[in-house]
A protein has these predicted regions:
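Hydrophobic beta-strand signal
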Residues: 141-142, 318, 343, 358, ...
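A generic structural motif
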Residues: 110, 171-175, 335, 350, ...
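Cleft-lining beta-strand/loop regions that shape enzyme active-site pockets
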Residues: 2, 30-43, 47-64, 119-123, ...
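Interdomain regulatory linker/hinge segments that flank or connect interaction modules
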Residues: 47-98, 176
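Conserved functional hotspot residues or short segments at active or partner-binding sites
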Residues: 356-402
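Bacterial Sec-dependent N-terminal signal peptides
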Residues: 1-37
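PDZ/PDZ-like peptide-tail recognition elements
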Residues: 82-122
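Functional cores that coordinate and move charged inorganic groups
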Residues: 304-308, 336-339, 344-345, 350-369
Length: 402
């Protein structure tokens, strides 16, 4: 009887302790929320007052769009490099990025790591770049009066693009001759050739090169694969080198060509659960046995890493090349007042083995490249057949070839 009373007494004490702990936790959370809200309102008030004084008594007249726009971009610069603000005049540029259409010279550019310069990698046939005589390997020295030395591809690209019909002076150095050349180029509307080439080698190995994951690219990849298969293809090389990504849905459709229906290829996870998504294969594949090699390099990013990493995790392809870029962050466009937009990072991508492809120690390094941590500090994951793969930034190839 006494034992039963003691047991009941202990239950009441434990219940009371749990209630006190729950209450204490709620008080702490409420206080943290209050502190956070106070910090937000305090800093907004300080910012408003600073600008008000600048506007009233600063020695020169300020351009509100320029000054406040710089403040917004400075705030976003402290976050990841993919959260970006687009005022009304720049929204069109964001839409062009999503559709694969833009105004520029029509050439692929890339960072030459040995030279530390941005070079022309491929002028598109019939483009302003091709008509001006630009060649693969040409080193970009300046655009108009802006020197491009030690600049990254994003910086150079932003200066090559502009309004249709505008002209600029491009200065390059041609390594094959050592000569410095200048040419005047007129920008015009460009539609990216996301699938510039596919073909069949004499040894019956097929080759498909995909430049970007723009809307509809999966249909062209599907058509190319079926055509090569009808021509006797016995193995496929799928080249994603230099592919900076694009539509995740298109990436899932391409992987779905080679893996069964109802497989979760990508999960997105972030702070708000209602914004989390699972991307599954939805149709039956067209081939599950064809040997496939996926080629990647340091400029293979985002949707390209979902494709190569998904094929690796499901043991459907061998990944060959160098470690990929490591962009595993999810962005969504958010409408802002006065027709502006915010491209906002809301979560991270996780591929079939449950690893995240985002570089863990991302930082704004010189040139915009990530700093990868050693494998000894990363976590192990398993592919479908039990092979060890790791997180820690991008996809590490099964076979490393530089």
């Amino acid at each position: 009887m006494a034992i039963e009373k003691n047991r009941n007494k202990m239950k009441r004490i434990l219940s009371a302790m749990l209630l006190v702990l729950a209450l204490a936790a709620s008080i702490v959370n409420a206080q943290e929320d209050k502190d956070h809200n106070f910090k937000v309102s305090k800093n907004i008030e300080v910012f408003n007052n600073i600008y008000r004084y600048l506007d009233m008594i600063y020695v020169d007249t300020l351009d509100a769009d320029e000054v406040i726009g710089s403040g917004i971009k400075g705030m976003l610069r402290s976050l990841d490099p993919y959260t970006e603000y687009y005022p009304e005049k720049e929204v069109k540029r964001l839409k062009n990025m999503l559709t694969g259409k833009y105004v520029g010279i029509g050439a692929v550019i890339r960072q030459n790591m040995k030279l530390g310069r941005v070079v022309i990698d491929e002028p598109y046939e019939g483009s302003p770049a091709a008509e001006a005589g630009l060649k693969k390997g040409d080193i970009i020295l300046s655009i108009n009066d802006t020197v491009m030395t030690d600049k990254n591809t994003a910086f150079v690209s932003s200066h090559l693009r502009g309004d249709p019909g505008t002209t600029f002076l491009l200065k390059i150095k041609r390594p094959s001759t050592g000569k410095t050349m200048q040419m005047r180029i007129t920008r015009r509307a460009i539609t990216l050739p996301y699938l510039p080439y596919y073909g069949l080698r004499p040894d019956s190995i097929g080759y498909i090169n995909l430049n970007s994951f723009t809307d509809g690219c999966s249909k062209d990849v599907r058509r190319a694969f079926i055509d090569l298969k009808h021509r006797g293809m016995k193995g496929l090389v799928f080249d994603l080198r230099g592919n900076g990504g694009g539509s995740v849905s298109e990436a899932v459709k391409i992987v779905n060509m080679f893996v069964p229906k109802d497989i979760t290829l990508v999960r997105t996870r972030g702070k708000m659960k209602r914004m989390n998504s699972d991307y599954k294969t939805t149709v039956e594949p067209i081939d599950t046995v064809m040997p496939i090699v996926v080629m990647v390099n340091g400029e293979t990013a985002s949707a390209s890493e979902i494709t190569s990493g998904g094929m690796q995790d499901l043991d459907r392809a061998v990944v060959l090349g160098t470690r990929t870029y490591g962009k595993g962050l999810v962005q969504v466009p958010v409408d802002l007042p006065y027709n502006g937009q915010l491209k906002l990072t809301t979560g991270k991508y996780y591929i079939p083995s449950n690893r995240c492809i985002q570089a863990i120690n991302y930082r704004h390094a010189r040139g915009g490249y990530t700093e990868h941590i050693p494998d000894s500090l990363t976590k192990e994951f398993r592919t479908r057949n039990g092979r060890i793969v790791r997180d820690g930034g991008g996809i590490k190839p099964d076979i490393e070839v530089k």
